[in-house]
Every structure is written in structure tokens, then in C-alpha cells.
């Protein structure tokens, strides 16, 4: 789903990034492991071990591996980078190399740090909604701000993680043409218009994580299916 490279061209998730993806993400995404752990904890507390879960933009399968270790057995991952999927642990999930959501009936959709690389977000969110059971849950993590002051604080966090200034500046330039940012308010209103109830469960400089429950409108009342 994601479009990274260490050269001067636009960011691509190539074999170089795939080989170090989790380490790279920990340095460049605020609270990367914390958000993943929240997803795993939520699944642990609210789903059966046989629930169907898909990780959209699964990269090398880090989240799926954690879910597998907790006993979940019907796990799926989709990513448009074959380099990522090639390095994912094949025994934990079924994987798809695609830029589309594989059609199925899901209990849980995880979509962390992926949609900001997709131009037509509404179309992809509609696909998620259509394939999510009533009462099902979407966890969505996105970059939601281009405010210069927020960017400055975000970059300061990268420096504290050991990322050098030149790497920060180069990656910012590489992402310019491949990352399409929308605001927190845009995500909330768009998701609510599709029948989700939305809560913010994590936020850091420029990034927001939403917990979205799919509900059904029947005779003037929202029913969750739970």
C-alpha cells in the first residue's frame, strides 16, 4: 500500500527499505510499537481467536506476527510491495500483493500508516466499510497535519531517535509527491458519513489513530451488531 527508497527519487518501499522496515518505522513513526500493541490488545479483549482480521499495508508482517503470537488464526495481510510481502512470515497469515482490499467479510481491519499514500481515500474507505461486518472495527492511523510547527516537533522526535538531519530532510523531500495528507476533521466526518462511530485512541506530532466501529442505521437507531 505504501509507496521508500534511499535514493533521491520519490519514496518507494523497495528491497532496501523492506530489509530494515521495522527498525526504520520505529525511528520515523511516533509511537509505532505503542499503536501496534494497542491494536493487538483491542483484538485480544474484543475478538474471538477465529475472527477474520486483515492488516492493510501489512509491510513485513510485524503486526500479524504479534497477533499470531496471541493465538489468532484467521489472519490476512495485503500490501502493494512484493519486497515487503517476500519478507513477511508465511506461517502466520495469508498474504496478498495488491493495492486493493481483498473482498471478504472481516471482523477487524487494521490500516496503519497506509491511507496517506492513497489519493482516493474515500474509495478505499468505502471498500473497507463494505467488507467489514456490522459491529466490526477499523483501526486507522494516519499522518494528519502539514502544519510547519507540528512538522518541526515531529522532526525533533526523529532526531531524538537518532535520525540525522540530512536523512530527515531527504525523506521529507522524497515524500512530497507520494503522500496525500488530510486533516483529523476530514477523517472524522468522512468515516461518520459511512456509518462509523469514531474515537481518537492515539495522537502524536502530525499523526492520529482512530478507532472506528461500523454501525447500522435502522428505523432511526444505530445498531452495532454486538
Q: Model segments located where?
A:
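Conserved class I S-adenosyl-L-methionine
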Residues: 1-48
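A short SAM/SAH-binding and catalytic strip from SAM-dependent methyltransferases
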Residues: 108-121
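C-terminal alpha-helical "lid/dimerization" subdomain adjacent to the S-adenosyl-L-methionine
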Residues: 143-193
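Conserved beta-strand signature within the Rossmann-like core of class I S-adenosyl-L-methionine
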Residues: 136-143
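Core SAM-dependent methyltransferase catalytic element
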Residues: 194-226
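Class I SAM-dependent methyltransferase SAM/SAH-binding core
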Residues: 54-100
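A short acidic, Gly/Pro-enriched loop at the edge of an enzyme's catalytic core
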Residues: 101-109
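A short glycine-rich, Lys/Arg-flanked "PGG" loop and its adjoining helix->strand segment in the class I
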Residues: 123-134
